[in-house]
Amino acid sequence: MRSRLLAATVTALAATALTTACDDAPEAVQLQPSTQPSTQPSSTRPLTLAPCTDLPDLPTAECGSITVPLDRANPGAGTTTVAFARVPRTDQSQPPLGTIVPNPGGPGTSTIDFSGPLYAQGLAPVLDRRDLLLIDPRGTGRSTPLTCDALADPTLALAGLDERRTAIGECGEQLGDRSAQHSTTAVAAADDDIRAGLGIEELDLFGDSYGTFLMATYAQRHPERTASAVLSGAYSVTERTEGAMGAAALRRAITLVCERTRQCDGPTALADLSALATTLRATPSTVDVELDGATRQVPLDEWQLAGAVGKAFSSAPDPELQVGVATAASAARTGDLTPIRTLVSRYLATEVATAAAGVQAYAVAADWAVSCHDYPEAFPGGGDDREAAYERGLAALDDADFAPFSARAWSTRGSYDSGACLKWPHAPSQGAPFTAGAPMPDVPVLVLSGDLDANTPVEAGKQAAAQFPNAEVVEVRNAGHTPSVSEGGMVRILEFYAAR
């Protein structure tokens, strides 16, 4: 699901040397780098590549770009540029075994600069005979940036729910048709243009978080070009995960962390959080956030608490932080809010820093353009009065399913507000890239879910796997969101590629 900026997408923890697949695996087309970069219109004409002079962590990388239509059904709408970089396989003496194309998620996150070196490092054991193709989705990174003034202020992360939703809606108004032009199907189409231009027969898809949504879309639309897929921190294109499913995963994760660290008791921690949430719902407090030497005071209520606690279990595991949630809730039982204020303050400062990272790393407008256009509505059927329909749906939820928080606080928390797009202009093309049960390629698919992930839980991974006829689901112990960043997860990924 949406994870604003992944702390790391792939890790180099996989130090175990794994042999590559057998020599009689299907060959991909041998690529020959050119001497000059070029930007070419969308077509099957060969693309040219040149050494990337500004990627020191990827010294062999070759860069290029392609110009594609903003709207393929309306040539007069103009064009946009999509950037890519290819890291050639290290062993050029043998036939290639494929091309891995990863996406780190977001939406809105850069692939080339932000996570390219991490993918290259983590996948190194299988990149001797596989190329690595890094593509910045349209609107992000080195591709033509998508921006909107309404979301330019990173301190919007400190704003209340209504102010955030209003700003997101204003961004949609400012983008107009450009929102639909940066949808997941548009991103997948550009990816296939690059594949064709480089003469690659098939792609080995690798998605983290939103990348699993993108790669499922590519596979559905281009089945004959899909060789395999790895989906890490996965979710289905037709289901939402931030509601009761995520709350159940949070309860499980807190219990597991306490059991495994032996530094807290799961049921007690959940009871303490529930008591604190009840208190802050009735009597909000305040918390100070330090930003660039200045102090901002913001409300500390149940909604803010749900955002901070949910985020602690929606990224790569941090045992100190996660045990700290239980410790802070316990202290609050005795009237000491200092630890919980520290937890929330750090969470909010991180949210602001993420929003301030800049379009080269994280394009907030591209994030919301995809999220509001492609993700299913939480409570559809409102017609012209989506907000009223949403409120009716929210009111009908059972708080018990969202413990230790209320249904409202959990369902609208921070970056995972299920009503974030209520003010976004509705587009006729809005909706999931494909429907449940749509035909998918019968290729090997590995789905990894972390047992400590409250963002894209194990159940969401099973739903993602069910989209494909031949998918294996692996629950990775002690892994959080995007298990590819865990040692156990990356080892499974390398084994998957080595077996092909």
Could you tell me what each predicted segment is?
Residues V289-A308, F313-E320, A355-A365:
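Structural motif
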Residues L18-A21:
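C-terminal motif of bacterial Sec signal peptides marking the signal peptidase cleavage site
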Residues A28-Q30, Q40-G307, A369, Y375, ...:
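Gly/Pro-rich cap/lid or specificity-loop segments adjacent to the active site
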Residues M1-T9:
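Bacterial N-terminal signal peptides that target proteins for export
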Residues D23-A25:
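Bacterial signal peptide processing site
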Residues T338-Y375, F379-P380, A389-A395:
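Long, low-complexity segments enriched in small/aliphatic residues
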